[in-house]
């Protein structure tokens, strides 16, 4: 664990960036990650049963998930790649704290609203974001930190639909997004508790 990681507060959840150097450089990265998130046929998590909710930010998401992916790829076609690092997708996972996950599991009507707000943060207002909330009930050898905990996968298009420039994702950006997500979760959970609605 790095010194930077030691200073992060995980009490309200943690953000894990899966886009390491050389990862997601394949042209089919976007549909593969989407398939994994949804447990689609042919994916490594085919027929997963722990998907609670999914959607997209910055793309039409009420018709078909394949249409979402087409929209991602259309934006990418407009970007001219100047370097050897041809990253086609960013994949990040926010793992809720155990307590927050329990509250959200007991109040599923809030999951849609919270996950959309979280995707808005991850998008920075210019990067299309597909997301899927998992209950954490299924064992996942690829992401052991998510086992037994509610979590949300973010598939972020690394090309801006506003500027067509690449997303700069590094430790500082991950830390910034993590803090924003933690603050959002704290606010939303506190409001839920104060409303007298949490079960």
Predicted regions and their residues:
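N-terminal nicking endonuclease/strand-transfer module with a His-rich metal-binding environment
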Residues: 1-199
């Amino acid at each position: 664990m790095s010194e930077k990681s030691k200073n992060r507060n995980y009490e309200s959840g943690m953000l894990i960036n899966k886009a390491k150097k050389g990862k997601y450089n394949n042209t089919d990265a976007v549909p593969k990650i989407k398939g994994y998130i949804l447990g689609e046929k042919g994916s490594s998590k085919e027929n997963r049963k722990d998907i609670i909710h999914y959607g997209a930010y910055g793309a039409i998401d009420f018709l078909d998930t394949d249409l979402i992916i087409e929209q991602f790829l259309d934006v990418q076609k407009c970007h001219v790649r100047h370097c050897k690092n041809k990253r086609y997708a960013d994949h990040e996972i926010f793992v809720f704290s155990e307590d927050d996950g329990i509250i959200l599991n007991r109040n599923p009507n809030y999951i849609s609203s919270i996950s959309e707000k979280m995707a808005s943060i991850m998008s920075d207002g210019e990067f299309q974001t597909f997301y899927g909330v998992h209950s954490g009930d299924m064992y996942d050898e690829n992401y052991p930190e998510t086992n037994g905990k509610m979590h949300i996968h973010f598939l972020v298009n690394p090309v801006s639909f506003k500027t067509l420039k690449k997303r700069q994702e590094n430790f500082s950006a991950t830390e910034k997004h993590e803090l924003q997500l933690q603050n959002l979760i704290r606010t939303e959970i506190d409001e839920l508790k104060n409303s007298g609605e949490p079960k």
